[in-house]
């Protein structure tokens, strides 16, 4: 009885016939879980690998609830609590195995203090005896570290962090791009419109995920020496937020080391000509308040001397957590002339927090000059919010298109962004996205606009004959020019306007080059 008390103290055990869930709609990756459970994978376990609020626990519940009554009797859901260790968990599992349990769903496995050291017990002992084991945990990086070490070649990973727009739309039954952005690209119960919600997610799901995983690693210094240094000086979140605030497609140490200037604040000031907000906003106060809200430190306030090693290590872990995407970029695809790779933050909530922080601070009267009226305040706040959503819409469309066509044919399709200065006339031209079918020698040019209005200026680059000739010569003959925006689909002077939500939903089912018609 003493041993039983020990393991029940640190884990919660729920038998399969006690599991029920009201969630009917399923993640697209659910069939991968079903496939693992219904087929033989000798000596292997399955891991639901992803950030918080991406449906891992719900998927476990859904699978268990659909089992027959007979199979439910052979199934158990175990929730690991803090201070649980592998000895306690193994004792509980052996007892259950002796009673006929063969399906083990182990949630919050990264709470097990020595999981990264003894996690191969699941594969080498229980799975080898014919048990089916599915694990999941909040600190998903800990699972990745185990996969690269003690569970190498013994684990099937099901990735849950990335929730494309179409899947999000299906799960919550809403086609709004705004909802997707405001909910942070996760399956949370409430939108990330409050700074507290977005900050809590960043602290726990991202920063905490990295640090807790490294703390439980036998070789934390080998895996994350630079990250650990930033954490010890309480500067990791600051560096992460300064990377995000650049709102650019390439982050450097020099850029992160610059004094913080809120991108939504300064970009909105410079993009609104009338009225001139230079004389209406207490800019320095608003910037400082936003900086404080995001926990950002400037170079002279940091104890750590930020280096390329720090930045590269942080980027690497963000890649492992599926929060970061690197997209190859070319100045000329035909000649092979490269430009810097694009770097995109995949989790909208991380970026939308910057808009949330600014807007919250702009609610304070002290941020405005006495000459600024309520209407002007509201206009500025709306435009600042639209600025961030515009950046996010570009990121979402570019990332989802890239991932889709990489999956269809890695070698045939090229998807990236293009921004160049034409050498013959010194014109600066750009496309928010270019899609090239290398097999056919065809190019598609896209502008992405967070707007429901058709404005002629939106297509100035798409109508630039010098730019089109450059694309023909360096990427492939321009087949079609498109604007992706939030309005209704239509056609204006050979330029197609497609609704962004409609386009993103088509991406989920496309199996070849998308045909605008």
Where are these regions (language model features)?
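Conserved lysine of the Walker
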Residues: 56-57
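Accessory nucleic acid-recognition modules appended to NTPase machines
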Residues: 218-431
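Conserved P-loop NTPase "ATPase switch" module shared by AAA+ and STAND
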Residues: 97-119
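Domain-level recognition of nuclease-like catalytic cores that cleave nucleotide substrates
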Residues: 482-517
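Interdomain motor-coupling "hinge/lid" segment immediately C-terminal to the ATP-binding subdomain
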Residues: 146-284
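N-terminal pre-Walker A segment at the start of P-loop NTPase domains
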Residues: 1-37
């Amino acid at each position: 009885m003493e041993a039983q008390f020990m393991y029940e103290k640190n884990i919660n055990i729920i038998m399969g016939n006690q599991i029920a869930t009201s969630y009917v709609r399923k993640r697209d990756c659910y069939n991968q879980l079903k496939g693992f459970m219904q087929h033989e994978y000798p000596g292997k376990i399955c891991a639901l690998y992803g950030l918080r609020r991406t449906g891992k626990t719900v998927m476990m519940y859904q699978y268990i609830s659909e089992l027959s009554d007979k199979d439910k009797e052979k199934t158990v859901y175990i929730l690991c609590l803090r201070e649980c260790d592998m000895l306690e968990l193994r004792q509980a599992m052996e007892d259950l195995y002796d009673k006929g349990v063969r399906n083990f769903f182990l949630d919050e496995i990264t709470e097990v203090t020595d999981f990264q050291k003894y996690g191969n017990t699941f594969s080498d002992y229980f799975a080898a005896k014919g048990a089916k084991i599915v694990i999941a945990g909040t600190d998903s990086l800990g699972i990745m570290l185990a996969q690269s070490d003690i569970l190498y070649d013994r684990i099937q990973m099901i990735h849950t962090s990335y929730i494309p727009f179409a899947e999000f739309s299906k799960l919550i039954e809403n086609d709004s791009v705004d909802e997707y952005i405001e909910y942070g690209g996760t399956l949370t119960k409430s939108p990330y419109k409050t700074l507290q919600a977005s900050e809590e997610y960043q602290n726990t799901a991202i920063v905490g995920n990295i640090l807790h995983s490294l703390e439980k690693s036998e070789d934390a210094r080998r895996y994350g020496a630079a990250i650990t240094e930033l954490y010890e000086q309480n500067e990791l979140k600051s560096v992460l937020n300064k990377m995000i605030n650049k709102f650019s497609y390439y982050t450097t140490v020099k850029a992160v080391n610059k004094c913080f200037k809120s991108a939504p604040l300064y970009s909105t000031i410079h993009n609104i000509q009338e009225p001139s907000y230079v004389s209406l906003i207490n800019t320095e106060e608003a910037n400082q308040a936003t900086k404080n809200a995001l926990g950002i430190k400037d170079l002279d306030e940091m104890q750590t001397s930020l280096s390329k090693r720090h930045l590269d290590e942080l980027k690497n872990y963000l890649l492992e957590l599926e929060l970061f995407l690197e997209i190859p970029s070319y100045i000329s695809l035909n000649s092979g002339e490269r430009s810097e790779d694009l770097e995109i933050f995949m989790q909208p909530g991380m970026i939308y927090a910057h808009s949330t922080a600014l807007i919250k601070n702009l609610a304070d009267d002290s941020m405005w000059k006495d000459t600024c009226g309520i209407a002007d305040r509201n206009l500025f706040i709306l435009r600042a919010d639209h600025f961030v959503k515009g950046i996010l819409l570009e990121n979402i469309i570019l990332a989802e298109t890239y991932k889709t066509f990489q999956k269809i044919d890695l070698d045939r399709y090229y998807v990236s962004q293009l921004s160049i200065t034409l050498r013959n006339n010194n014109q600066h031209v750009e496309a928010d996205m270019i899609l090239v079918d290398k097999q056919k020698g065809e190019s598609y040019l896209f502008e992405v606009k967070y707007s429901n209005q058709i404005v002629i200026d939106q297509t100035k680059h798409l109508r630039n004959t010098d730019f089109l000739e450059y694309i023909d010569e360096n990427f492939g003959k321009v087949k079609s020019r498109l604007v992706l925006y939030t309005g209704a689909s239509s056609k204006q002077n050979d330029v197609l306007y497609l609704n962004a939500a409609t386009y993103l939903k088509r991406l989920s089912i496309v199996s070849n080059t998308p045909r605008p018609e």
